[in-house]
Curated annotation (Swiss-Prot):
Pfam families xrefs: DmpG_comm, HMGL-like
Molecular functions per Gene Ontology: 2-isopropylmalate synthase activity; 4-hydroxy-2-oxovalerate aldolase activity; manganese ion binding
Catalytic activity annotation: (S)-4-hydroxy-2-oxopentanoate = acetaldehyde + pyruvate
Stretches that traverse the bilayer: none
The protein's name: 4-hydroxy-2-oxovalerate aldolase
GO process annotations (BP): catabolic process; L-leucine biosynthetic process
Amino acid sequence: MTQKITLHDMTLRDGMHPKRHLMTLEQMKSVAQGLDAAGVPLIEVTHGDGLGGASVNYGFPAHSDEEYLGTVIPLMKQAKVSALLLPGIGTVDHLKMAHGLGVHTIRVATHCTEADVSEQHITMARKLDMDTVGFLMMAHMNDAAGLVKQARLMEGYGANCIYVTDSAGYLLPDQVTERIAAVRAALKPETELGFHCHHNLAMGVANSIAAIQAGANRIDAAAAGLGAGAGNTPLEVLVAVLDRMGIDTGVDVWKIQDVAEDLVVPLMDFPIRIDRDALTLGYAGVYGSFLLFAKRAEKKYGIPARDLLVELGRRGMVGGQEDMIEDTALTMARARGLTVNA
């Protein structure tokens, strides 16, 4: 088993989803400084949908990516800052902006069958000498052999780390083991391997341990689990478990608990928990950030969010198709004879 694991905090990026991207600069500063002091080595900061995510489709943030990054990066004493970039949302210009502000790690994210769209962004990030990560989302929608092909593409473009990403919180530990082990065996020994998951089936910690045992050395988590759906793997819990297992993370067991309890929980707009809708995300294999969109559509069209999420899963909807949630709700409402106000 790998004895040194890099933990990557998601509180200030994935945690933007339940905050509707409206975190204040003061909240960002407070949490980032707490994470830094607790020894977290890598902290992601951006709009929930990555660089350039500010839009009608995904939601407008309280501040620009430049403001968030420009506020947090100068305050870090040991932690590095990462940014997420989804080709088609974020551009090479966004990438250059992030690099100019001092972003250390760029994570270029695509659907798990579409690694080919990442070539331009990964190639540019490597030219800029950034820590360059290929991030394969919705990994339950591709089998181990398929993920291997996609991972090799990203590695070939220049990514020095590949992530298997359970965006829906759908995978079970044996499925994580199968995918991670296959990708690990296929990559160059020097290429790092990461795992990101959601806690929709309460599998966050178990799946992260399975990933580590199968060869992953970077693991995503969030303080108090703040993230889309039922949240990400709770960082403070994962740190405690890894400490008991004798795995070095460099994160202080007690300080990270205090960050979660004293800084992150108070800024939650609602409890991050496995309610029936978040559970349905995991059960039906639906992209985590769809949750609030489905709840809004329930209020507008009278279709229970759970029913809508199941239908989205049946249709195989993926990240980036947020605009189709409303369309699906409208179709379902009409099919059920519900009155829809235009």
